[in-house]
């Protein structure tokens, strides 16, 4: 994730590079065709799907745990929020990916999902998160996803899809 804001900055109107590092200049021109570029594509892709894998583990296993239902739903909502965040980044950078919604074993080969299928899942995850996350956390849990964070990310997802109504 440390490269992500840098990557978006380079792709913005303010992005510019005179670096001899070719890929940095490519990013300023929205050229992402060096798929061997370790920091640019491989690291982000892997880290996003590791995050999604972890969220799927929570979403698959926490429902079976006996605990307070409000706390359980908050945990599930946090995992849903984070999974939506990872898929949001995937759609922004690559406009498609694989939609993996359950834990899988090592021989699983996922199928490509369309950009719209991923947006639909983002909306579903964020709607659940908004319904179950608190408005705020106490100081010990500061930094966790909140209802406002889920609303804001859902708003960004709508804007990316040109859903203004």
Predicted regions and their residues:
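Conserved, well-structured interaction surfaces
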Residues: 21-94, 108-117, 126-142
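Short coil/turn linking the two alpha-helices of tandem helical-hairpin repeats
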Residues: 91-93, 98, 160-165
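Outer-membrane beta-barrel proteins
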Residues: 139-146, 164-165
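A structural signal for well-ordered alpha-helical segments within the folded catalytic domains
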Residues: 49, 53, 148, 152-153
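Acidic, glycine-rich segments characteristic of secretory precursors and extracytoplasmic regions
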Residues: 1-15, 57, 116
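Short edge-strand/loop segments of extracellular domains
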Residues: 103-107
């Amino acid at each position: 994730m440390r490269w992500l804001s840098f990557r978006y900055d380079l792709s913005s109107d303010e992005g510019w590079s005179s670096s001899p590092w070719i890929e940095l200049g490519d990013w300023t021109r929205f050229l992402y065709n060096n798929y061997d570029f370790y920091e640019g594509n491989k690291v982000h892709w892997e880290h996003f799907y590791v995050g999604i894998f972890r969220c799927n583990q929570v979403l698959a296993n926490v429902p079976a745990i006996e605990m307070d239902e409000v706390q359980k739903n908050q945990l599930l909502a946090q995992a849903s929020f984070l999974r939506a965040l990872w898929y949001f980044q995937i759609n922004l950078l690559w406009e498609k990916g694989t939609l993996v919604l359950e834990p899988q074993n090592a021989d699983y080969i996922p199928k490509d999902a369309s950009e719209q299928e991923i947006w639909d899942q983002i909306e579903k995850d964020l709607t659940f998160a908004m319904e179950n996350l608190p408005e705020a956390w106490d100081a010990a849990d500061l930094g966790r996803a909140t209802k406002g964070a889920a609303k804001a990310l859902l708003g960004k997802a709508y804007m990316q899809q040109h859903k203004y109504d």
